[in-house]
């Protein structure tokens, strides 16, 4: 009888594994479909703007029925909000977790610049920022979610490190600590400028940002 119970136990474990496999596949398909919807939404929002973008066209790009979108997102606004979270929140988490206290302030600034250039300007994330800039005034909730998910998390980190730099004598004035927006202002300028005038007079964002850091901290890279 013990042998039969042992065999029965093995069979039960096998059945559990067999049952789990279809569930895993369904979960993977759901995640793939969700990612496809978000990718299609980004293309539509960039091509048409938030106001003119239609969920019908998002569904067509994602090659799904329109009704499928509502299984994942309540409406177009919630779809856009999730796009912001999905694309930018992990990057924000990386900045929040970075060990910045014991790094020279110029090195901190260069790290932030490099992250912006590689992970935002060099990717489709810059299109999300352009959308926020262009559509935010007409759709305040879109600006609100960007502020909550990105700015309200990153700005205190930067401000705190700049204030520490003032205390330590790394910075002779507290202007940057009071207005940390100054640190990244040229990066946003480059996003807007190259979106509007890049065909005529493109800005080299890396050269622009390092010239800006030289103005703020003196010439030369940190060691």
What are these regions (language model features)?
Residues 120-148, 192-196:
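Amphipathic alpha-helical segments used for helix-helix packing
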Residues 53, 79, 124-128, 141, ...:
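Alpha-helix N-cap and coil->helix boundary residues
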Residues 144, 166-214:
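Hydrophobic/aromatic-rich alpha-helical bundle segments in the mid-to-C-terminal region
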Residues 67:
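Key DNA-contact positions within bacterial/archaeal DNA-binding proteins
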